[in-house]
Amino acid sequence: EICACLVGSEMCIRDSPNFMNIPGENLVGVMSSNEYLTRVNLMDAANPDSDTPVLQGKKVAVIGGGNTAMDSVRTARRLGAERAMIVYRRSEEEMPARLEEVKHAKEEGVEFMTLHNPVEYLGDERGRVKQMRLQKMELGEPDASGRRRPVPVEGAIETIDVDEVIVSVGVSPNPLIPRAFQGLEVSKKGTIVVNEENMRSALPDVYAGGDIVRGGATVILAMGDGRKAAAAMDEALRG
């Protein structure tokens, strides 16, 4: 009889990619980095003869400044984008991406439009994205993350031509998992609260790790959580 289980947000349904909830996000050619990278890497979507070929834009904007954003923009560049841009609302110094990821992206010809934030995507008569409107930003006082808060510069809006936009602004924990386990303690961000020493949740026989606890981190950290939880579960089951 199984008396304990480990919960991770990759169990059945992936984490939900975040969007910015701005006009035009439903246009053809606007997608999450999760969808883009999954289709290219796992579904052979870069092959035009595949069942579900991915759009290979020539003017590609990737929104975000993390490692996944760098993966996305470098992939777009390798798939033939003539102009591949990172659009990030803070400065390069505040980017969460690893320095080597930024360096490699620049070496591949990626443009960095820092201190810019999209406010709207514009489409053509076929419903395909053709432009994005960007709000110029400046840095204010640090926010809760410790990084300086981006503040809009009044009246500073510019329009850029694009034919593909990849949104890479993080993910949110799958909300179905906490609902499936009544009694779990959940944070304001929707992550499961655990004892960090053994990854045990508020339910004594339920352990959790990875993004459902951390809110988005690396595979290495998720593997570490799993090992820690497995050891604790083994000890508990042995009595």
Model-derived regions: residue spans:
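Single conserved hydrophobic/aromatic residue that forms the stacking wall/gate
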Residues: E1-G8, I13
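Conserved beta-strand-loop-beta-strand element in the redox core of flavoprotein oxidoreductases
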Residues: S9, D124-I157
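Cofactor-binding loop segments of dinucleotide-utilizing enzymes, especially the Rossmann-like FAD-
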Residues: I13, G65, Y88-S91, D211
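FAD-site-proximal beta/loop scaffold in flavoenzymes
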Residues: N26-G57, P142-G216
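Rossmann-like NAD(P)H-binding beta-loop-alpha module
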Residues: A45-G80
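A conserved FAD-binding loop/helix module that cradles the flavin
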Residues: S72, I212-R238
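Rossmann-like dinucleotide-binding cores of NAD(P)H-dependent redox enzymes
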Residues: V73-E120
